[in-house]
């Protein structure tokens, strides 16, 4: 971990991160993780900096060794209704609420915190500075990537397994050719344009 982070004085600290704010399709997925200090996990890092194979291996280790972990999500309809920022905050609240052990303190990746029942702190670049947030980023990314692979089986013409729903040139081309699926976020510019909403 670079840029040493000074932990707050608390016994049970949860880390929270999200994946999927930028894509044009699918849910934004969040995870909350309370690690077990007696069962350390070696190699935790920002999920984006790990190979897929390493992420999958760490996913299994995190879900096995963590004191508690939980996933949260906000669906495309909620994103369209609330906007992506508020939907992400809602998904983070859901992840924390899903923990079977209530944390004393929550560390959140980024620069803002959702409203929570316990103290929280936003940590910029937290996914590479705080082990709990790194673990959450891995759970969220593996989960969302799996969902995109499943969506790819339903809609093979879009290439979701490759671009994970992000607005790549390939995705934008397929969107123009085939139109939007019911899983696309209608409030996002490229989807709006295809649907004739702008």
Swiss-Prot record:
Keywords: Cytoplasm, Endonuclease, Hydrolase, Manganese, Metal-binding, Nuclease. One of its GO terms (cellular component) is cytoplasm. Residues 11-198 form the RNase H type-2 domain. Manganese or magnesium. Binds 1 divalent metal ion per monomer in the absence of substrate. May bind a second metal ion after substrate binding. SUPFAM superfamilies: Ribonuclease H-like. It holds the Pfam family RNase_HII. One of its GO terms (biological process) is DNA replication, removal of RNA primer. It catalyses: Endonucleolytic cleavage to 5'-phosphomonoester. It is found in: Cytoplasm. Its EC number is 3.1.26.4. The keyword Magnesium does not apply. Its main location: cytoplasm. Belongs to the RNase HII family. This is Ribonuclease HII. It comes from Yersinia enterocolitica serotype O:8 / biotype 1B (strain NCTC 13174 / 8081).
